Design a protein with these regions (language model features):
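Structural alpha/beta core scaffold segments of enzyme domains
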Residues: 1-200
Length: 200
C-alpha cells in the first residue's frame, strides 16, 4: 500500500483554537450600523394547503419594517440541477416541515421573533408521503401532480419519480462473476451538507 502524505494521517486544524474558544467570527456575529434583523415563519405541517396567512398583527408591532409572504414576489422555482421544485417561500401549499412561509424584517432580533409569533396561518392538511419506496410504488398521492411542468424535468417517469441516474460502469455481470465476495445491503446514512460553517 502506498505511503500517503495526507490520506489516513492525523492533522492539526489551523482553525481549531478559534472555534473551541468561541473567538471565531461567523456571519451571524456580524452587525452593521442600521442593519435590520430577519426571522422566518416556517411550516409545522408536512403537507398542507395554505388557506390563509394573516400578517396584520405582525405588521402593526412597533419596530417591524416589513413582512413578506410567497405572494409578495413573482412565482419562481429553484432546486437541484435535476429539478426545480422548490419556491423561496411557500405559495398555496407547504411540502415539508420547516418550509418558509413568511419573513419579518425588524429593528432587532427580539422584535422580529415576536412578530413571527403573531402571524396566523390556517392550513388544510393533505396526505403526506414520507417513505421513498412507497412514494415511487404508485400507491401514494403524487406530491407534485404538475411535476412534468417543472423546469429541469428531463425524464418522463411520472408520479413521484422525477429523475433517475444510472451509475453502472463496465460489465456489471462479469464483475460479479469475477468477485471473491459480493455484499448486497441497504444502508441508511445521516443527511450531509458540503456547505460547512466557516469563520469569517
Amino acid at each position: 500500500m502506498a505511503d500517503f502524505q495526507t490520506i489516513g494521517k492525523n492533522h492539526v486544524r489551523v482553525d481549531a483554537l478559534e472555534k473551541v474558544t468561541g473567538k471565531a467570527t461567523y456571519a451571524g456575529d456580524v452587525y452593521l450600523q442600521g442593519m435590520l434583523m430577519c426571522k422566518l415563519l416556517t411550516s409545522n405541517h408536512s403537507h398542507a394547503r395554505i388557506k390563509s396567512i394573516d400578517t396584520s398583527a405582525a405588521e402593526a408591532l412597533p419596530g417591524v419594517r416589513c413582512v413578506i409572504t410567497g405572494e409578495d414576489y413573482p412565482d419562481a422555482r429553484f432546486g437541484s440541477g435535476a429539478l426545480k421544485d422548490r419556491r423561496i417561500m411557500a405559495r398555496e401549499e407547504v411540502f415539508y416541515i420547516g418550509e418558509p412561509l413568511a419573513a419579518v424584517a425588524a429593528d432587532d432580533e427580539i422584535t422580529a421573533l415576536e412578530a413571527v409569533e403573531l402571524i396566523k396561518v390556517e392550513y388544510q392538511d393533505i396526505e403526506h408521503v414520507v417513505d421513498p419506496l412507497k412514494a415511487i410504488s404508485g400507491k401514494t398521492p403524487d406530491v407534485h401532480p404538475d411535476l412534468e411542468d417543472f423546469e429541469g424535468y428531463g425524464f418522463a417517469l411520472g408520479g413521484n419519480n422525477c429523475t433517475m441516474l444510472d451509475a453502472d460502469r463496465g460489465d456489471v455481470e462479469q464483475g460479479f462473476k469475477d468477485s471473491d465476495l459480493i455484499v448486497e445491503e441497504t444502508y441508511h446514512t445521516q443527511p450531509i451538507s458540503q456547505g460547512f460553517l466557516e469563520p469569517m
